[in-house]
A protein has these predicted regions:
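Predominantly the C-terminal beta-signal and adjacent terminal strand-loop region
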Residues: 176, 180-250
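Transmembrane beta-strands of outer-membrane beta-barrel pores
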Residues: 37-43, 68-74, 108-114, 121, ...
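Short glycine/proline- and aromatic-enriched beta-strand/turn motifs that initiate or cap beta-hairpins
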Residues: 17-73, 249
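Hydrophobic alpha-helical segments and helix pairs
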Residues: 81-128
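Residues on the lipid-exposed face of transmembrane beta-strands in outer-membrane beta-barrel proteins
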Residues: 37, 52-56, 92-96, 123-131, ...
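Flexible, solvent-exposed loop segments that connect beta-strands
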Residues: 39-43, 72-85, 114-116, 146-150, ...
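Residues that define the transmembrane beta-barrel architecture of outer-membrane proteins
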Residues: 46-50, 84-90, 117-123, 151-157, ...
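Repeated loop/turn-to-beta-strand initiation elements of outer-membrane beta-barrel proteins
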Residues: 60-66, 100-106, 132-141, 167-172, ...
Length: 250
C-alpha cells in the first residue's frame, strides 16, 4: 500500500520537473543550462526537489538534453516520521526536428537512489507540433511512457499556450494521462488488490521573465487530479507543485 502512495507522487514529481518546452528546437550551436528548485506535496508526503540540466542543439534538427534531480522528502507512515534524500530519476533526451513545426522526442529515465523514485528504467517517446504566431505559440503533443506497468506505463497527450509580451511570456499547459495500473504484489508475498484508476490530468501555469540577454527566470505552479493520482482508500489528496527555474542561454 505504501508503495502505491510513493508512486503516485513520484509520477507527479517526474512530470513536473521536465524542464524543457514543447516548441521547436533551438538553433544549431545554441543551448540552455537550467537550475531548478521546487516544492511538491501530496499528503502524507512533501518535500523539495533541486535539479540541474542542460540542452544543446548539435544540429539544426537534433537537440540533446539531460536533467538530474535530487529530492529531499519527509513523510509520516504508521506512526513513524521518515526523512529521505538522494538522487531521483535522471533523464537523458533526444529531440529531432522532422519538419517545420513537427518534432519527435525520445527520453530515457534512469532508476533513482532513494525509495521515493521510480525503481526501474523507463523510456518515453512521442510527437510534438507547434504553431508560431506573432505573439502566441500553440503547442500540442502526444507521447507514451514505457516502464513498469504498475507505476509508470501510460499514454499522454496535451496542449500548451504561450503568450509573448514585452520581455516575458505567460504560459498554460494541460496534460491528460491514460493508462491501466495492474494489481501489485506487496512485500511479504501478499497480493494487493488495489488496482488503480487509469486516468488523470495535470494543469500548469507559469511565467518566463527575461532578466538579461542570457538569463531567463521561469516561475510555475502545477496541480494534478483524477483517479490516477487521487485515492480515497489510501487518503491521498490531489498533488501540487511550485517551482522556479533559472536558465542560462548560450
Amino acid at each position: 500500500m505504501f508503495k502505491k502512495i510513493l508512486t503516485c507522487l513520484t509520477l507527479f514529481a517526474t512530470i513536473s520537473f521536465a524542464a524543457w518546452d514543447n516548441v521547436p528546437i533551438l538553433k544549431k550551436g545554441s543551448g540552455q543550462v537550467a537550475g531548478k528548485i521546487g516544492y511538491t506535496s501530496q499528503d502524507p508526503l512533501s518535500g523539495v526537489i533541486v535539479a540541474a540540466g542542460v540542452r544543446y542543439s548539435a544540429l539544426n534538427w537534433l537537440e540533446l538534453s539531460a536533467m538530474v534531480p535530487f529530492g529531499f522528502y519527509s513523510y509520516s507512515y504508521q506512526g513513524k516520521y521518515i526523512d529521505e534524500s538522494g538522487l531521483m530519476n535522471a533523464q537523458i533526451g533526444l529531440r529531432f526536428q522532422v519538419s517545420q513545426g513537427f518534432s519527435l522526442f525520445v527520453d530515457g529515465h534512469a532508476p533513482g537512489s532513494i525509495e521515493f523514485s521510480q525503481d526501474q528504467f523507463a523510456v518515453e517517446f512521442g510527437l510534438q507540433h507547434s504553431n508560431l504566431f506573432s505573439s502566441v505559440t500553440w503547442a500540442k503533443y502526444i507521447g507514451y511512457m514505457l516502464g513498469d506497468p504498475w507505476t509508470n506505463q501510460y499514454l499522454y497527450f496535451g496542449t500548451e499556450i504561450q503568450i509573448l509580451l514585452n520581455h516575458f511570456v505567460i504560459y498554460s499547459e494541460l496534460r491528460i494521462l491514460m493508462g491501466q495500473e495492474n494489481a501489485h504484489y506487496c512485500s511479504g508475498g501478499y497480493s494487493c488488490s488495489d488496482e488503480g484508476g487509469s486516468n488523470g490530468f495535470l494543469f500548469g501555469i507559469g511565467v518566463k521573465i527575461d532578466l538579461t540577454d542570457v538569463l531567463t527566470l521561469d516561475i510555475s505552479a502545477e496541480l494534478g487530479s483524477g483517479d490516477r493520482f487521487r485515492n480515497e482508500e489510501l487518503n491521498l489528496g490531489e498533488p501540487y507543485a511550485f517551482g522556479a527555474t533559472l536558465f542560462y542561454n548560450f
